[in-house]
């Protein structure tokens, strides 16, 4: 007789192969048809809210792996919070204005922005942004990210722009907005001012020169003829703007002799200068810095004085301790110059070329002027030493060219006006990781005023007018309200389409009586755009809330979006726009190198999704300790694919053994479960606790490692290995089999829900197969499982820790016996155990050792019994010996266990008594 048909063999229609690249798009289409976002929101209506506010990606190009990491982390958080019982809406957004889009329109459409009208150029920029919003939206959706994709927020929307103008108006009313002449970061290539957040640092080779400034009036301190003050600079092009030399009031300065000349340098730099210049530099006189204040030097090549002044920013890290000072080309220079009433001279235009004030260098680009100026200094015998240095230098974030400091009239937000309040708010926010708090605190504490104006076209205009009669700047609650009203109807294009009179309240008159006005031509910094999303989105959308529960972006946003959002929110409302801020690190390869095109070490998320599936990418995100830099490579993705396969196969095995299980009818009560089953539920309880803790603390790698280890070790290597016999061999409706199925059901039901925020497609695919699940239900509307208190039995855990330690030693002995060809399979073996007295007492209380060890028989010997020779002694259990022998009896044809009772049943002579009984009752 073929007894195979009498076994309860595993069976399921759930596919073994994930085939994710084909199956995921089908699931995505189903979500779209059923409107999964609306379904979930409806299911959570009236629950406590959790609002994660999306930091808007830039609407330019295809998504890259950084986007994928960011969006998947957010999706995991939102889906977990939904399943934790919260109403967790997610409104995705896009940052749509600014220089990068202008550059792409100029480059890809071949447009000369100066040759087309402003309105036409803005139309092209808007079309370009909308094109990439559509492209990126589909790419994000393909990653399995759930959100209100039909109603995202866009910084170019009319309502958004109107709300942004409102925030600007609130700040202006509090006198936080002002116009000033100050040095700002300036990109000559892009012809615009830049904010600190738009600066990136890269290595650059620069000229480093030491220059002599002859003393003109020594003020009774520097009395010798032919005395020179020596300065050092890495920007020779700024020398035409030199107005002063700054010393530190407390430093010691020395006059040294060089042939017939006398040079002044800081004493603290003397040894390094002797070495560099290869000169003896004998000291003639000493002075304290403050004694030299007011000494007047002559500019080396311009008919102009250069005065010695004092400043705290002077250091002895490099140079001579005598700092070349050009108030038009540096923030510290500007500040110290302001203290001394120096003019702000900036002989460089918006393209980085010298103006007429640059004298002989007029029309030259600053970088081209460097060698010319150095040559002129040589000819004038004013050059002491010339060198080249490699150093970290500020570059434009978009064109990657070096920037300059340039004094221009710009609009600023005064950070001093709300700095104290912002620092107090930082203390109230939860920063994850905690070092983020110090980082943003120091940035706000040290930050200069925020330059918010840009000399570009594609953006939100600064809503300020000028009276043509008196030149006064016009901004008031009344004018802001009118501009808001128009923008809400027409968008910011109205600023460029309408004359000033139509943008102002009807009959508006300046205080001077003037009735003719012109508009400001600058636009706002894009960081002001995205930085006001707390108003434009959180306050304006009824389904959201202000402040947000969480902002989550890369750690570079401490100086970017977190910073601008905090600044505008505190300035306008006196409060931070977020309760917590979470950051992720950056992507690196396995060698810790940053992703770059030149290294060819990038991983394309669209390619991974196409070849492996989005759930593999999502599992990688979950597995990464993303709060630090995240390693990625094709090899790592392959590892994730293998881990996914392990999890999927485990879930499939559970399903296949539940094909005849109805949880409503077939459950076995916890109190009636055998110990091994209660141990499995104990492990499930611990995993559930750990996973939920991981989600709550945003430590998603805990989620991955807990579930993966549970599938690989506690389930596959222990529990499932042990209960396979029961599942396949015991009577279909036997209590023993139903007990195992009860556990399998609880494990399956819990694991699918625990992993649903991560393996979003796979969880959706498997959910309809889970026994007892109502047709048409969604795993995304389910709630997270809980660890029942009765499962968490400490005494049981302690007992099974010991038992599994014994099992581990037995497994080693069986493997050695197999290698020594004593047995060919554990079921052909009988294991003889020789324990110490304590262990014997413990093992006598375990009734089913052969089931736990998966052998045909176990013989437990007394502790006092003499141990035979050749015994395998346990490595980790003192005095415990194991002997592996061939099992007595015959092999049961049905369960393959060797049993001396095989042949006793005449009807089924090839079966053991257990199997004969089961088959007889079929």
Swiss-Prot record:
One of the record's GO cellular component terms: cytosol
Gene3D superfamilies hit by this protein: 1.10.730.20, 2.170.220.10, HUPs, Ile-tRNA synthetase CP2 domain-like, Valyl/Leucyl/Isoleucyl-tRNA synthetase, editing domain
Origin: domain of life: Bacteria
Cofactors demanded by this protein: Zn(2+)
One function term, GO molecular function aspect: zinc ion binding
Residues spanned by motif 'KMSKS' region: 594-598
Protein's name according to its UniProt entry: Isoleucine--tRNA ligase
Name of encoding gene: ileS
């Amino acid at each position: 007789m073929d007894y195979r048909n009498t076994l309860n063999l595993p069976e399921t229609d759930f596919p073994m192969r994930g085939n994710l690249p084909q199956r995921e798009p089908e699931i995505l289409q189903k979500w779209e048809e059923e409107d999964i976002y609306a379904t979930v929101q409806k299911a959570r209506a009236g629950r406590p809210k959790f609002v994660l506010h999306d930091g808007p990606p830039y609407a330019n190009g295809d998504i890259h792996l950084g986007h994928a990491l960011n969006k998947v982390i957010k999706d995991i958080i939102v889906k977990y919070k939904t399943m934790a019982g919260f109403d967790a809406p997610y409104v995705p957004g896009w940052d749509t204005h600014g220089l990068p889009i202008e550059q792409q329109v100029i480059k890809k459409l071949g447009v000369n922005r100066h040759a087309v009208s402003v309105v036409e150029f803005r139309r092209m920029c808007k079309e370009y942004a909308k094109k990439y919003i559509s492209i990126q939206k589909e790419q994000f959706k393909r990653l399995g990210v759930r959100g209100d994709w039909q109603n995202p927020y866009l910084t170019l929307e009319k309502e958004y722009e109107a709300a942004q103008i409102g925030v600007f108006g609130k700040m202006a009313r509090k006198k936080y907005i002002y116009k000033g002449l100050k040095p700002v970061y300036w990109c000559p290539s892009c012809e615009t001012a830049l904010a600190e957040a738009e600066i990136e640092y890269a290595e650059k080779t620069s000229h480093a020169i030491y220059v002599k400034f002859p003393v003109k009036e020594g003020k009774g301190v520097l009395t010798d003829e032919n005395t020179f003050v020596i300065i050092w600079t890495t920007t020779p092009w700024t020398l035409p703007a030199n107005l002063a030399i700054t010393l530190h009031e407390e430093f010691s300065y020395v006059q040294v002799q060089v042939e017939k000349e006398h040079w002044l340098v800081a004493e603290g730099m003397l040894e390094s200068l002797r070495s560099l210049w290869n000169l003896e530099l004998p000291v003639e006189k000493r002075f304290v810095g403050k004694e030299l204040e007011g000494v007047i030097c002559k500019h080396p090549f311009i008919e102009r004085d250069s005065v010695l002044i004092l400043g705290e920013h002077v250091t002895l890290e490099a140079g001579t301790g005598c700092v070349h000072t050009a108030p038009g080309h540096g923030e510290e220079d500007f500040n110290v110059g302001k203290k001394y009433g120096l003019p702000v001279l900036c002989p460089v235009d918006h393209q980085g070329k010298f103006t007429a004030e640059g004298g002989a260098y007029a029309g030259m680009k600053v970088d081209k002027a460097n060698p010319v100026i150095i040559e002129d200094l040589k000819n004038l015998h004013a050059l002491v030493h010339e060198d080249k240095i490699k150093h970290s230098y500020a570059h434009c974030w978009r064109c990657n060219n070096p920037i300059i400091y340039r004094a221009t009239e710009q609009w600023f937000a005064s950070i001093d006006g709300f700095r104290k309040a912002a620092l107090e708010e930082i203390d109230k926010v939860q920063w994850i990781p905690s070092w983020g708090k110090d980082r943003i605190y120091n940035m706000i504490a040290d930050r200069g005023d925020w330059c918010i104006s840009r000399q570009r076209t594609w953006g939100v205009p600064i809503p300020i007018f000028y009276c043509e009669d008196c030149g006064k700047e016009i901004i008031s609650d009344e004018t802001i309200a009118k501009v808001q009203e128009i923008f809400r109807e027409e968008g910011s294009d109205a600023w460029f389409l309408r004359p000033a009179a139509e943008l102002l309240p009807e009959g508006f008159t300046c205080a001077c009586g003037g009735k003719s006005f012109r508009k400001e031509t600058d636009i706002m910094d894009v960081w002001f755009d995205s930085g006001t999303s707390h108003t434009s989105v959180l306050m304006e959308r009824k389904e959201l809330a202000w402040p947000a529960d969480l902002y989550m972006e890369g750690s570079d946003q401490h100086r970017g979006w977190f910073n601008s959002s905090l600044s505008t929110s505190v300035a306008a409302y006196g409060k931070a726009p977020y309760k917590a801020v979470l950051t992720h690190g950056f992507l690196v390869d396995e060698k810790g190198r940053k992703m770059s095109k030149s290294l060819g070490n990038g991983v394309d998320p669209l390619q991974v999704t196409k070849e492996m599936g989005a759930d593999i990418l999502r599992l990688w995100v979950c597995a990464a300790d993303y709060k630090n830099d995240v390693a990625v490579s094709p090899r790592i993705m392959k590892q994730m694919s293998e881990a996914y396969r392990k999890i999927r196969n485990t879930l499939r095995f559970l399903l296949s053994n539940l094909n005849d299980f109805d949880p409503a009818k077939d459950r076995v009560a916890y109190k009636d479960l055998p110990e091994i089953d209660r141990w499995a539920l104990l492990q499930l309880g611990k995993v559930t606790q750990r996973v939920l803790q991981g989600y709550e603390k945003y430590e998603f790698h805990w989620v991955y490692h807990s579930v993966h280890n549970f599938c690989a070790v506690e389930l596959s290597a222990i529990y499932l290995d042990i209960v396979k016999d029961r599942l396949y061999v015991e009577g279909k409706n036997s209590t023993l089999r139903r007990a195992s199925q009860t556990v399998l059901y609880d494990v399956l039901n819990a694991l699918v829900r625990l992993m649903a925020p991560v393996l979003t497609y796979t969880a959706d695919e498997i959910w309809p197969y889970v026994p007892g699940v109502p047709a048409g239900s969604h795993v995304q509307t389910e709630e997270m499982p809980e660890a029942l208190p009765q499962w968490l039995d400490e005494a049981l855990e302690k007992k099974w820790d010991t038992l599994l330690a014994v099992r581990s030693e037995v497994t080693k002995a069986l493997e050695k016996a197999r290698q020594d060809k004593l047995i060919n399979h554990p079921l052909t073996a009988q294991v003889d155990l020789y324990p110490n007295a304590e262990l014997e007492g413990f093992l006598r209380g375990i009734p089913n050792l052969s089931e736990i060890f998966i052998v045909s028989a176990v013989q437990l010997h007394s502790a006092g019994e003499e141990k035979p020779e050749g015994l395998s002694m346990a490595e980790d259990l003192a005095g415990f010996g194991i002997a592996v022998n061939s099992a007595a009896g015959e092999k049961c044809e049905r369960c393959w266990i060797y049993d001396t009772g095989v042949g006793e049943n005449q009807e089924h002579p090839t079966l053991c008594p257990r199997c004969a009984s089961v088959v007889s009752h079929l």
